Regions:
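Contiguous beta-strand segments within globular domains
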Residues: 59-75, 196-203
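Substrate-binding/active-site clefts of carbohydrate-active enzymes
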Residues: 281-285, 289, 321-322, 326-338, ...
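Basic K/R-rich, polyanion-interacting modules in nucleoproteins and related proteins
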Residues: 173-219, 275-336
Length: 790
């Protein structure tokens, strides 16, 4: 009996050990996500946890679209879901024409249908029943591949970092079988994109010829005009014009008053099929993001997505809605006296759109600026962004408003004497851009080596997304066409080019990217020439930050260069002398052509000076708002009075002291229009207004003919800094500033022989000041003048 009990005890222990080891973790196979990973088990019907391999597995091994499918995931030690105790969900879709279709839930949406059952520690399972097709409700769409991601409930953890895929057999529905290519020359005058020539017909064309001269095996068009139906006939099949490198088709009998939606369908017979929107679309429909745009910003009735669309869809209308411009001949008066307000629509008003910004135009006029630089407004991925992630360059982003709203905003600006400058991003494009999708290395999730527009890897160290090759004639033609379109269609007054240092094909590092590059210079001059062919008065500004030799050559050609004074003005604003010299923002310092620099204290990209003063200020600047705003005003007096174009970042005039890192660097920032109700912040805004209006009313003081002298290096920290300006008609300014924490007696004396002396800001007439030093309070300044403005 004792022996029998011992045997029974050993059997129980063995069973316990076997059960516990069945879901223990083995070495993680990194290859498990490449058509992951199937099942080695000969017992195909047993899905108990005892038989599960690590990683993603499924039963049956060779699933049929009209049968049930069970998907299991066992987290290896290296998986982020290993040891995770919360709910686990499957994010899945049918891979159709290169996109995930019939996805049951958004990434951050947890629904019961997608919740996996926990089988044991680190083991989860889900069954797609009664069949794969019915579970996805995919209708008559052929199912040949599923995309799979196993995630935590908040989406922050993935079981496998890369997307996984399961091949499926579909015996009921088959993918469309394209016909052989028909070669035919495009109609004369046809260009890439949507060719509307009047009447009721439109010719569509898109370029497809890779670096090696190869092209896809077929191309079709789908749209409202053919009921989104693929057919091997003239309603859908596109012709091939190999001499032009294009697929094309003419669609006839269209209603000129109707807006149509369409896509291209192209691919290779033995490879992936993709849907493309037209790269030259002036309006797109985005099924993932349009639904979140408020009705007041863009009417939902104008964003109806087609049932049979997949991914981003293009639209067109033969009889376009014409905007009636009130201002057709606006011109920038003086490009060397631009006073630019850099504005981000999302963070400028509570509505985060064009209409909100339009309601503040009178405020901006009152402030005294004469130009607005809009951060990128061409279609970008998502709705909530700085905009430096462009995907469609000819379409304005709907998150800010309709096409007419953009035009009205520009028209209203022109009515008020304000120029409008678009911030444009041609260094790169996102993977949603048709040029990126057309030649895409899905295995490595990057640009394909045969892509004729993009570099596989950027030659410079500042790459984001997909890097345009600006020495490609295809790229240069595209960019020049887009620049001309924006000037003609929206009547804007110029451009600020983002990251032009990246317009290089020279392999370089952080230490060499700024070196002189004659090819980069040639590209930028070519773009400048194209702009001036369309509008000879347009201003062209570069975010370049290259060597002086290169920047001077570009400035001598007529372009203007961003000049970053943020560090120096943050230092002076905080009351610290080290690194606080202002000399670099003035063209006279290094022989730059007058007006060649657009200098700034702040930009969208830099930390806010008032925040730095609040956080790191010397003495009581951290706690004393009155002194902090005085320090910001002293900065302003020694910035806006320097000749040459200037740029202000939005709300700098209010002493906005929320960090750029608040809610993430590019994240939404809080509004503080109530700042203007505070006496100290209002006084700062008034200082901006006084000097900006001076620059507009007396431009000769800030012209190349005026005499300008200043002492603003670190060596003038003690004893006050000063600026002297005299116009050719005898108007004079003398500015003295104390950036320290102690009262200072200026080392420079007030000039003699002016006749009359005024405190320009207070308008008080002064006596007995000529030839004398000035006592200046901490963080304060005074502007002496021999005149007053009306």
């Amino acid at each position: 009996m004792k022996k029998t009990l011992q045997i029974g005890f050993y059997i129980l222990i063995s069973l316990f050990i076997f059960t516990q080891s069945s879901c223990q973790d083995k070495t993680f196979d990194d290859e498990s996500n490449s058509e992951n990973s199937g099942n080695d088990s000969s017992d195909e019907g047993d899905d108990n946890e005892e038989t599960l391999k690590e990683g993603l597995t499924w039963l049956p091994e060779n699933p049929d679209a009209d049968s049930e499918l069970t998907i299991n995931f066992k987290a290896p030690v290296k998986s982020k879901l290993y040891g995770y105790t919360g709910d686990v969900y499957i994010h899945t879709g049918v891979i159709t024409e290169g996109v995930w279709a019939f996805v049951p839930a958004e990434w951050n949406e947890n629904i019961a249908k997608c919740k996996m059952t926990k089988k044991d520690d680190n083991c989860w399972s889900i069954s797609l029943t009664p069949s794969i097709r019915e579970w996805f409700a995919s209708g008559e769409t052929a199912i040949n591949k599923l995309g799979i991601v196993i995630r935590s409930s908040d989406g922050s953890k993935k079981g496998i970092e890369e997307d996984s895929f399961i091949e499926v057999t579909d015996n009921k529905y088959t993918a469309f079988q394209p016909a052989p290519i028909i070669e035919q020359t495009m109609p004369a005058g046809t260009v890439e994109g949507i060719n509307i020539s009047g009447g009721s017909s439109v010719t569509f064309a898109f370029y497809d010829k890779d670096k090696n001269g190869n092209y896809k095996d077929f191309a079709y068009i789908l749209g409202d005009f053919n009921n989104w139906t693929l057919a091997n006939d003239g309603t859908s099949q596109m012709y091939r014009d190999n001499s032009a490198g294009c697929w094309w088709i003419t669609v006839e009998n269209l209603d000129p008053a109707k807006e149509y939606r369409f896509q291209y369908y192209t691919g290779t017979k033995d490879g992936d099929v993709i849907r493309l929107a037209d790269a030259y679309s002036e309006k797109i429909l985005d099924p993932d993001n349009d639904k979140y745009i408020p009705e007041s910003t863009y009417p939902s009735s104008e964003m109806v997505y087609p049932e049979k669309g997949i991914g981003i869809v293009s639209t067109f209308k033969i009889n376009k809605d014409e905007y009636s411009w009130q201002n057709n001949d606006f011109k920038i008066k003086d490009k060397d006296n631009l006073l630019i307000y850099e504005l981000h629509l999302r963070d400028f008003t509570s509505t985060s759109d064009i209409n909100g910004a339009m309601s503040k135009l009178d405020y901006l006029v009152g402030l005294g600026i004469n130009a607005i630089e809009l951060m990128p407004v061409q279609e970008f991925d998502g709705n909530d962004s700085w905009g430096y992630n462009p995907c469609f360059f000819f379409a304005m982003d709907k998150a800010y408003g309709t096409k007419d709203m953009y035009k009205r905003f520009i028209d209203e600006c022109h009515s008020r004497g304000i120029a409008v400058i678009f911030d444009v991003v041609y260094n790169h494009a996102t993977g949603a851009h048709p040029f990126a999708k057309l030649y895409w290395d899905s295995k490595n999730n990057k640009t394909a080596a045969n892509n004729p527009w993009f570099n596989v890897d950027a030659p410079h160290p500042y790459s984001v997304f997909h890097d345009f090759n600006h020495e490609s004639e295809l790229v240069k033609t595209f960019v020049k066409r887009n620049l001309k379109f924006l000037l003609d269609e929206y009547k804007i007054d110029g451009f600020r080019f983002d990251l032009t240092k990246g317009f290089t094909q020279r392999q370089c590092s952080e230490s060499t990217a700024s070196d002189y590059d004659d090819n980069r210079i040639a590209v930028l001059k070519e773009y400048y020439d194209a702009i001036h062919e369309a509008n000879e008065n347009a201003v062209v500004i570069l975010e370049h930050f290259c060597c002086d030799e290169e920047e001077k050559e570009l400035a001598n050609y007529g372009l203007k260069l961003w000049r970053n004074g943020n560090y120096a003005y943050c230092q002076s604003g905080m009351g610290w002398s080290e690194g606080s010299g202002f000399e670099s923002i003035y063209t006279g310092t290094n022989g730059m052509r007058f007006g060649g620099y657009i200098s700034f204290m702040e930009s969208h990209d830099e930390e806010r000076t008032a925040f730095k003063a609040k956080e790191y200020g010397n003495g009581d600047l951290k706690t004393n708002l009155a002194n902090r705003m005085k320090s910001m005003a002293a900065n302003t007096a020694f910035f806006l009075t320097v000749p040459g174009p200037k740029m202000i970042w939005q709300f700098g005039e209010m002493g906005y002291d929320v960090s750029i890192e608040e809610n993430g660097r590019t994240g939404r920032k809080p509004l503080h229009w109530e700042y203007l109700n505070d006496q100290y912040r209002k006084k700062l805004a008034d200082t901006y207004t006084m000097i900006l209006k001076l620059r507009n009313a007396v431009p000769q003081l800030f012209s190349s003919d005026a005499t300008f002298r200043w002492e603003v290096s670190e060596s003038y920290w003690e004893g006050c800094r000063n600026i002297s300006i005299e116009s050719i008609d005898g108007k004079k300014l003398f500015i003295v500033g104390n950036f320290t924490t102690e009262e200072q007696n200026s080392s420079a004396k007030v000039p003699i022989g002016w006749g009359e002396y005024y405190n320009f800001i207070s308008t008080e007439q002064l006596s007995d000041v000529a030839g004398k030093n000035t006592n200046i309070d901490p963080h304060d300044f005074i502007i002496y003048s021999n005149f007053l403005m009306n």
